[in-house]
Amino acid sequence: YAPKFLERGLNIPIHLAFSHDEEVGCIGVRSLIAKLANEIQPKPMMCIVGEPTSMEVIIGHKGKHSYECHVRGLEAHSSLAPQGVNAVEYAAEFIAHLKGMARRIRKEGPFDDLYDIKHTTVHTGVVTGGTALNIVPKDCRFEFEFRCIAGHDGRSLYEEAVRYAREELEPEMKLIDASTGFSFEELSVIEGLDMDPGEEVVTLVKTLAGRNDHAKVAFGTEAGLFQQDA
């Protein structure tokens, strides 16, 4: 389409932005947005992010906060299990707490009716730990995430979960061995998108798409980063 844009003799330029590693945390676009915000003048008026929406006009998506947790236990023979600290079992308690948070949010909200899933979600993915059935596992690692609607702070949910580990689980673990406990690493933070249906770019895209409706999606895109930082 670039040659067609040039043929039109446009008074307002159209910028094409290409990024990499969107699927693993929107990594590539961050430096591009910083350059866009600081070096390109005049600043572009609006941004359209292409996603597979069947031409549905999307005005919002959830933000994503993802983390890896490492539970450090104390290895022992399973016949002496009370003398060890079972990293897998403490990880399971923490994961069960995350599930409890998910149930609470599903019941109490907050809610946004434009989403198919109208509330923030909490999810645990990959879990690894243990070496053999007759050995109390000394390590367990797992990844979890919060996908948040606008106005629901993913960082505060993460801090709530960490408090549970620090206040409820670690004291019991450290009674047996002081070196045991939980550590957390942030994997990625993808900002959510939340637009007013009356914004100029929304009206333009609806005209281009030939439709009047709009919606929000649960998956993340680079659009939230453009909205916040560009």
Segments (PLM) and residue ranges:
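Metal-dependent amide/peptide-bond hydrolase catalytic core
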Residues: 68-230
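Acidic/histidine-rich catalytic neighborhood of metal-dependent amide-processing enzymes
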Residues: 1-66
